[in-house]
Amino acid sequence: MTAHAHAGAQLTRAPFLLAVVVLAVNDHVLKAWCPSWWTGKLSDAAGMVFFPLLLQGVWELALETLGRWQGTSRRVTAVCVALTGAVFCLVKTNVHAARWYQATWGLLRWPLDVVAAWWRHQPVPRVGVVQLVMDPSDLMVLPLLGLALWTGWRVSREATQAPQPAPAWAVR
């Protein structure tokens, strides 16, 4: 086993961490500073790497907590990537799927909104909906799912490889 052969290892890899930074900077700085079509595309692009790896990491950590995790699976990676792609396609092209997505994420985000309101000494907010722009041209970022797939598969491959002995120069 390698150093990354643990549940959620893909959450420690550069593509995931870079996607987190891009999402944070884009959504909290760039969209406020200079909102345009490209800030939306940038969020979508980072999301194609972020969401499947997050989904896989949460799945693996849940299995590990239950004592049922048996290692990173290429199949789980593929399912998480496919699920992310399918949901993204639906919410960008289907009005009913988009409304469901907005309401569901608004409901899931509400507890965080309550904590934020409490922290700021504000009244409890109503359950809201998240913003979503239905734009079929956003589908152009789908090829970036390949980076998430590659990252997950690489973690899986490394987890099954035998540990490499230290080089002779490092043992001295």
Name what the model sees in each region.
Residues P35-F50:
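Loop-to-helix transition at the N-terminal end of transmembrane alpha-helices
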Residues V25-P35, L90-R99:
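Juxtamembrane "helix-exit" motif on the non-cytosolic side of transmembrane helices
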Residues M1-P15, T72-V76:
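N-terminal membrane topogenic signal
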Residues V58-G71, W153-A162:
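Membrane-interface junctions at the ends of membrane-embedded or membrane-associated helices
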Residues T77-A97:
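Hydrophobic alpha-helical membrane-insertion segments
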Residues A117-L147:
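Hydrophobic alpha-helical transmembrane segments
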